[in-house]
C-alpha cells in the first residue's frame, strides 16, 4: 500500500510563502552582515528632483564616516572641508549648516535602511525616521536619500547621493 501525501493549493501556497519569508530573512541577515562596520565617505552630491541640477552641499572635499553596529545602531557624520576653524558667530553658524550628524537604531527593509533618530546635530531630526536606499557596487556602498525639501529653493526637492568605502 502506497501512502500518498495530498497537497492542497492552500497548503502549497502556505509552504511557498513560508519559504519566501525564510529566504527574505536570510537575505536580510546577509545584507546586515555586509553593512556592519565603518565606512569612509568617497563622494557626495545633491540633485534637484525636477531640474536634475547637481551641487555639492558639503563643498568639493567633504569628509565623513558612517558606522553600522551589530547592536543595530547607525552613526553618521559628514562635514565640509573648511579652510580654517570658525572664529566668529557667522562662521560658526555656517559650519553648523555645512555638516550632518545623527545616530539611532536602524532596520532593513529590502533596499532601504531606516534609522529612528534619537540624537542629532539638528533637533528637528530627533524622533524622526530617516529613510535611505542602499546598494553595493563592487566594494563600495551607495546610499541615496529619499527626496527632502531644498532649504535654499522653496517648493524644490533634493535627493542626496553618497558613496562610501569600507574603512
State each model region's role.
Residues 10, 22-167:
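Lipid interaction determinants
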Amino acid at each position: 500500500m502506497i501512502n500518498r501525501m495530498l497537497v492542497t493549493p492552500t497548503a502549497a501556497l502556505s509552504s511557498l510563502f513560508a519559504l519566501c519569508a525564510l529566504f527574505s530573512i536570510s537575505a536580510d541577515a546577509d545584507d546586515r552582515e555586509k553593512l556592519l562596520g565603518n565606512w569612509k565617505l568617497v563622494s557626495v552630491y545633491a540633485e534637484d528632483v525636477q531640474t536634475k541640477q547637481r551641487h555639492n552641499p558639503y563643498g568639493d572635499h567633504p569628509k565623513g564616516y558612517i558606522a553600522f553596529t551589530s547592536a543595530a545602531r547607525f552613526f553618521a557624520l559628514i562635514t565640509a572641508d573648511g579652510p580654517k576653524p570658525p572664529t566668529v558667530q557667522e562662521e560658526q553658524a555656517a559650519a553648523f549648516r555645512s555638516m550632518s550628524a545623527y545616530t539611532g537604531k536602524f532596520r532593513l527593509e529590502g533596499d532601504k535602511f531606516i534609522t529612528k533618530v534619537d540624537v542629532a546635530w539638528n533637533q528637528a531630526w530627533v524622533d524622526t525616521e530617516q529613510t535611505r536606499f542602499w546598494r553595493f557596487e563592487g566594494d563600495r556602498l551607495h546610499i541615496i536619500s529619499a527626496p527632502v525639501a531644498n532649504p535654499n529653493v522653496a517648493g524644490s526637492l533634493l535627493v542626496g547621493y553618497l558613496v562610501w568605502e569600507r574603512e
